[in-house]
């Protein structure tokens, strides 16, 4: 599976050089040149940071029958076994990565991470899967199970619905 987050480096050796301003208004072109040179180090850590967040899901089940990590692995495995491409499988793997950080808006954490490197369809699917999934249980908790209908005109409605039915249930 290709790494979608850039190449990984030894980020244990971060450069010590730092900009000198105390507010953006005081910053200089030299400060920003330094920051832009070093931003690659931060970008190189994205994959490791995502894997760390994914591993943390193993510590929480939230009352569900399996841990959030097991669920993520099951979702990705189902998608892979169904012949989905690598990008889709990665989306399936990390779609709930924000669950322990922001349970009620977790889809937006994963979709924000993925947006620069995935298709529009996959981004929409990850961003909206929580609302689409609500169709199957929101009526049990006093919410509108048909909230997903607000996206009925989206070209990705069926795509996202299929993700929830086949892989994220």
Predicted features along the sequence, with ranges:
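Metal-dependent phosphohydrolase cores
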Residues: 2-93, 97-169
């Amino acid at each position: 599976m290709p790494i979608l987050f850039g190449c990984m480096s030894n980020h244990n050796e971060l450069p010590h050089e730092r900009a000198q301003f105390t507010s953006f208004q005081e910053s200089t072109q030299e400060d920003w040149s330094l920051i832009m040179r070093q931003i690659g180090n931060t970008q190189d850590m994205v994959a490791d940071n995502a894997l760390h967040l994914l591993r943390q899901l193993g510590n929480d089940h939230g009352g569900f029958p399996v841990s959030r990590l097991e669920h993520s692995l099951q979702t990705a495995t189902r998608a892979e076994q169904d012949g989905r491409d690598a990008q889709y499988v990665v989306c399936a793997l990390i779609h709930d990565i924000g669950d322990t950080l922001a349970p009620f808006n977790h889809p937006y954490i994963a979709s924000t991470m993925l947006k620069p490197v995935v298709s529009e369809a996959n981004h929409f699917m990850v961003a909206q899967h929580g609302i689409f999934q609500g169709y199957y249980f929101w009526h049990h908790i006093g919410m509108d199970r048909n909230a997903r209908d607000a996206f009925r005109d989206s070209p990705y409605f069926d795509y996202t619905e299929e993700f929830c039915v086949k892989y994220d249930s």
